[in-house]
Amino acid sequence: MSSSSSITTTLPLCTNKSLSSSFTTTNSSLLSKPSQLFLHGRRNQSFKVSCNANNVDKNPDAVDRRNVLLGLGGLYGAANLAPLATAAPIPPPDLKSCGTAHVKEGVDVIYSCCPPVPDDIDSVPYYKFPSMTKLRIRPPAHAADEEYVAKYQLATSRMRELDKDPFDPLGFKQQANIHCAYCNGAYKVGGKELQVHFSWLFFPFHRWYLYFYERILGSLINDPTFALPYWNWDHPKGMRIPPMFDREGSSLYDEKRNQNHRNGTIIDLGHFGKEVDTPQLQIMTNNLTLMYRQMVTNAPCPSQFFGAAYPLGSEPSPGQGTIENIPHTPVHIWTGDKPRQKNGEDMGNFYSAGLDPIFYCHHANVDRMWNEWKLIGGKRRDLTDKDWLNSEFFFYDENRNPYRVKVRDCLDSKKMGFDYAPMPTPWRNFKPIRKSSSGKVNTASIAPVSKVFPLAKLDRAISFSITRPASSRTTQEKNEQEEILTFNKISYDDRNYVRFDVFLNVDKTVNADELDKAEFAGSYTSLPHVHGSNTNHVTSLTFKLAITELLEDIGLEDEDTIAVTLVPKAGGEEVSIESVEIKLEDC
């Protein structure tokens, strides 16, 4: 039996607990919410922090004046107040009001995903990086030697042993619960649910998450140089579950994985929950094509790579970036045990994903893509919006000390003390050049976009023609503005897997299983998740595809009107789209 199989019976049905260095439970008292039990404890250790802004951050931009207005200098009390009229960065969540996480409508996570609450919650300091003598180098998982594997297994075993005290913030389940709390409706900020996916928070949140997880593992084996491995799924040699995670009885093994995808099965980076009989070579080819599209074609600018802006007061899940969309989500779906688990546990659902050790290996490679993307050049650089830079999260470090962290402090992995062992990136040179058709599709024979949208359901392949805002643009114009194919108000049931593919200059007879064609523009995917305040579970967001390079490759730069085809792969009968347009956006 796997270690994750007993989760529902070993974790207590409570909301949160004060942190004690001895982890001793004392008397209980009720929270303001009658249905929630709050267990108090006393810490023998303490920390001191000045709330003076000069001691918070030496960076002049670190203390945003709007944060002061929100009372964030005194920390969490203002997190649940109604939002101000102007935007502001997302504050750390209010741990004292952490509530029930949800699997889906009417189904709550049966254990608390909330972390223990420190006694000095209103004085939690900002994290400062400790001094270091050498970088921690994260290796590709498939190439790890047995000495490394043994060390990683030992560290994970010791982390699992800490689950004997379910309130130990360093325990494996408490670490997994971080993802559950931030992603399944347990937290609210500004009166709205906090969600760290489907927006520009995706990359920085997960980078900080792995940073502390990695340091905890290292501390448990007394090795400050220990580094997490990365699942090198963007290289053909790494396109399978790394062997170290596929050993039954190991602390790195999880029973709740798709058993059809073990023993060296090639991963499909575009997986959408259904098994497709595709030759291995074609899967690998599709994978490299997807990587090129997501890292190069569709992400020439920061906004496309990181995702939509998500300031305080805005609705959660405004729109995901290219890598979060694919391959991040399909890897979750492919690994999770959808055939045997109702909700695709473990990797196939946000609330349970952290219960599989491979989650952290997967996200290490996702994080590596952040570094690789900036190396491609052009305008691929970090965002500069202060609402992004000053957004904050809450974590415990390896010494069980609580800290606040800012996005601005995680932009350079080397400054954080880690880097990635280099591996070839063959996808960089994998631009699809082979065309499905020899000429231009007759757009006059295809219904115009105004006759197709709004679309009630994407239950079959559809084609439409659409007019571009400008044609025959100069190189300078292309450098200044990216041409964006924009799908407005895509709505669907967020409890289901969703994917559809987008093609240009082909009709609905296109072979959508072969993605290594110049006309393939990109895909939209979604992992099941829940908005706690959204009782009808309908997600509505915008999906954007950068198409400037694509139009050049297909030879459509001078065309005023182009053909677009959408091919549903999963959940299309639940997908509606209000409108589609092409816009020019500053890069």
Swiss-Prot record:
Catalytic activity: 2 catechol + O2 = 2 1,2-benzoquinone + 2 H2O
Stored InterPro entries: Di-copper_centre_dom_sf, Polyphenol_oxidase, Polyphenol_oxidase_C, Polyphenol_oxidase_cen, Tyrosinase/Hemocyanin, Tyrosinase_Cu-bd
Biological function: Catalyzes the oxidation of mono- and o-diphenols to o-diquinones.
Cross-link (2'-(S-cysteinyl)-histidine (Cys-His)) at residue(s): 183-197
Cofactor(s), by name: Cu(2+)
Domain of life from the UniProt record: Eukaryota
Presequence positions on this chain: 1-87
Naturally occurring in which organism (per UniProt): Solanum lycopersicum (Tomato)
Any one GO MF annotation of this record: metal ion binding
UniProt main location, coarse: plastid
Compartment(s) of residence: Plastid, Chloroplast thylakoid lumen
Protein name: Polyphenol oxidase E, chloroplastic
Entry binding sites for Cu cation B: 328, 332, 363
GO biological process, any: pigment biosynthetic process
Disulfide bridges in this chain: 98-114, 113-180
PROSITE patterns on file: TYROSINASE_1, TYROSINASE_2
Family statement: Belongs to the tyrosinase family.
The enzyme's E.C. designation: 1.10.3.1
Positions contributing to Cu cation A binding: 179, 197, 206
One Pfam family it belongs to: PPO1_KFDV
Keyword line: Chloroplast, Copper, Disulfide bond, Metal-binding, Oxidoreductase, Plastid, Thioether bond, Thylakoid, Transit peptide
Keyword DNA damage attached: no
